[in-house]
Amino acid sequence: CIPKWNRCGPKMDGVPCCEPYTCTSDYYGNCS
């Protein structure tokens, strides 16, 4: 999973943010 504040894009790479954080965008955001 991706740690808090790191870049994320679950629709692109399929990797979720670590609990309890969520990505601010499906394609290009950060975990918060």
Curated annotation (Swiss-Prot):
Keywords: Alpha-amylase inhibitor, Disulfide bond, Knottin
Any GO molecular function: alpha-amylase inhibitor activity
UniProt xrefs under InterPro entries: Proteinase_amylase_inhib_sf (IPR011052)
Disulphides: 1-18, 8-23, 17-31
Classification via SUPFAM superfamilies: Plant inhibitors of proteinases and amylases
Domain of life, source organism: Eukaryota
Tissue specificity: Endosperm.
Recorded domain comment: The presence of a 'disulfide through disulfide knot' structurally defines this protein as a knottin.
Purpose of the protein: Alpha-amylase inhibitor. It is active against alpha-amylases from Tribolium castaneum and Prostephanus truncatus larvae.
Name of the protein in its database record: Alpha-amylase inhibitor AAI
Record organism: Amaranthus hypochondriacus
Source taxonomy: Eukaryota, Viridiplantae, Streptophyta, Embryophyta, Tracheophyta
Gene of this entry: AAI
